[in-house]
């Protein structure tokens, strides 16, 4: 068994790096920046150009808003809660980008909670956290249930809800005792297959 501390150190310092000259010197900002980089992988498709425009060259409009919302949240963090906040703040942003930013941020915060578990514990309702939808998840889900899916960067809210429902169906079938949120599917699918 590999030493757990080594794995934890890798996850928390390399995978979720604190950026150079960050606007905010805390782990929340590091998690949001990492999630943003994940979203921007999809920017090459040209389908999330409004999001890309508002968050390029250090503008970070959406990231900054998400940061403040999480810091000032009066309720437990969940996908629906944060997605709704971002949609209300800027209705022009592509839903695909919003869901990925929110869900990847929550995923990284869950990892930080588990691995660092110190003063920076975030109050997350994991049962209400959705799986971040991207090409990897859609490919694995398609292999499981045979359903074709459009490119994640083209997804609107109703496509997203359909995908989350498919994930929930799978989790209930495979893990009937589980009370996990859909984000668990993301962690399950990253195991080597």
Question: Where would I find each of the regions flagged by the language model?
Answer:
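Phosphate/adenylate-binding glycine loop and adjacent helical scaffold
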Residues: 1-92
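C-terminal accessory module of base-excision DNA glycosylases/AP lyases that mediates lesion recognition
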Residues: 1-28, 86, 90-193
